[in-house]
From Swiss-Prot:
Keyword Transport carried by entry: yes
Sequence motif Nuclear export signal, residues: 9-18, 82-91
UniProt similarity note: Belongs to the influenza viruses NEP family.
Oligomeric form and interacting partners: Binds M1 protein. May interact with human nucleoporin RAB/HRB and exportin XPO1/CRM1.
Additional remark text: Average number present in a viral particle is estimated to be 130-200 molecules.
Compartment(s): Virion; Host nucleus
Its biological purpose: Mediates the nuclear export of encapsidated genomic RNAs (ribonucleoproteins, RNPs). Acts as an adapter between viral RNPs complexes and the nuclear export machinery of the cell. Possesses no intrinsic RNA-binding activity, but includes a C-terminal M1-binding domain. This domain is believed to allow recognition of RNPs to which the M1 protein is bound.
Alphabetical list of Pfam families matching this protein: Flu_NS2
Domain of life: Viruses
Name this polypeptide is given: Nuclear export protein
Length: 118
């Protein structure tokens, strides 16, 4: 379940943040939260099926936003992979492995939602 996965990853990253003064980690947490909200809103639009007009009226540039989210996901995947390579802490390794898996799942969910809306 990606909802509980998001919560778990964010909680684990917050714990890691306490042990470091890394602004990068802070940025990653913010992007994960933003990604979760975006995925949830796309999911809601799909659940209301036929709500494409509502989605478009809220944001006439939803395709542009979709493209931007995919870029953010790719950036996060690269950032997580980089962190995974440089950390030797097992708690961090597990967290970043879970984050990577979550990002791949969410990318697929967003892709599926967007195809249904198109």
């Amino acid at each position: 379940n990606t909802v509980s996965s998001f919560q778990d990853i964010l909680m684990r990253m917050s714990k890691m943040q306490l042990g470091t003064s890394s602004e990068d980690l802070n940025g990653m947490i913010t992007q994960f939260e933003s990604l979760k909200l975006y995925r949830d809103s796309l999911g809601e639009a799909v659940m209301r099926m036929g709500d494409l007009h509502s989605l478009q009226s809220r944001s006439g540039k939803w395709r542009e936003q979709l493209s931007q989210k995919f870029e953010e996901i790719r950036w996060l995947i690269e950032e997580v992979r980089h962190r995974l390579k440089i950390t030797e802490n097992s708690f961090e390794q597990i967290t970043f492995m879970q984050a990577l898996q979550l990002l791949l799942e969410v990318e697929q969910e967003i892709r599926t939602f967007s195809f249904q809306l198109i």
